[in-house]
Every structure is written in C-alpha cells, then in structure tokens.
A protein has these predicted regions:
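Chalcogenol-based redox active-site neighborhoods
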Residues: 1-143
C-alpha cells in the first residue's frame, strides 16, 4: 500500500468491505502487464463508484517483484498489490496453476472475485492463456 510493503491478513483487510480481487499469473508477464492490470487502472474510478472499497491485484511473486511491477505503471494508481510469494492464498482458494512446462513454476490462475464482508460473491476463472471473464470491463457488469 502506498509503496510500502507490509504483511497483512486478508481476513482483517477485507473485513466489512466490498472488494474486487483479481489474480494474475505473474508480474512483468505480457498479458498481465499490457492488458489485464492496465484495464483496472483505466476503470478504477468506475469500479469504485459501484461501491467497491478497494481493488487488489494478487500474484505468486515475492514482495520485491510485486512492488517493482506496481510502481512501473506510476506512483499514483490506487490498486493494492498482494504478493502471495508462497502461494498460500492461491492454494487456499484452489486457484493454483501449474506452469512448470513453461518454466514458470506454480502460479495463480487468472481470475477475478467480488468479496463482500469476507464472503466470495462472484468468482470468475479464466481458461489457460485467455483474458476474457476477469477483465475490468467484465467485472463492472457484475457490480
């Protein structure tokens, strides 16, 4: 948050809030960097206008990679990054994706969820290699 890395509890962080959480396979990867994340930057205000408290982007990357990737866009976007370095959250939600054939290890599936008061209201998971259901444009339809 605000360029500062800290350990958080997502249960505490998401408590009594309406959250959009989207997951990406990896920071600095082409689709994530050129399409998925920029779409949320572009539509941030429209999503927040629908009563969303915060937008989070999660990836199975360490905090240093995630921080560098987030600030590579600008210092003024408001999307909060979650570095799930050990894939604990990703595994908990059963959103792990085996990318070992591509020499990328285990990553997050590409997904988006709406969470209200720590309850998942909507979850959309992309088919491997696709970017359709988890875009910012599509999440606006569900809000």
């Amino acid at each position: 948050k605000n360029g500062i890395s800290e350990i958080i509890s997502i249960i505490d962080e998401f408590n009594n809030k309406k959250i959009v959480l989207f997951g990406i396979p990896g920071a600095f990867t082409p689709t994530c960097s050129e399409e998925h994340f920029p779409g949320y930057i572009k539509l941030y205000d429209k999503i927040i206008e629908r009563g969303v408290d915060n937008i989070y982007c999660m990836s199975v990357n360490d905090k240093h990679v995630m921080k560098s990737w987030l600030i590579s866009y600008s210092d003024d976007h408001k999307i909060i990054g979650i570095a799930d370095g050990n894939a604990e959250i990703t595994k908990h939600f059963n959103l792990i994706s085996d990318k070992t054939k591509n020499h990328m290890g285990f990553r997050s599936s590409r997904f988006v969820m709406i969470i209200i008061n720590n309850q998942i209201i909507s979850l959309k998971i992309e088919n491997p290699g696709e970017l359709n259901v988890s875009t910012a444009e599509n999440i606006l339809k569900d809000l």
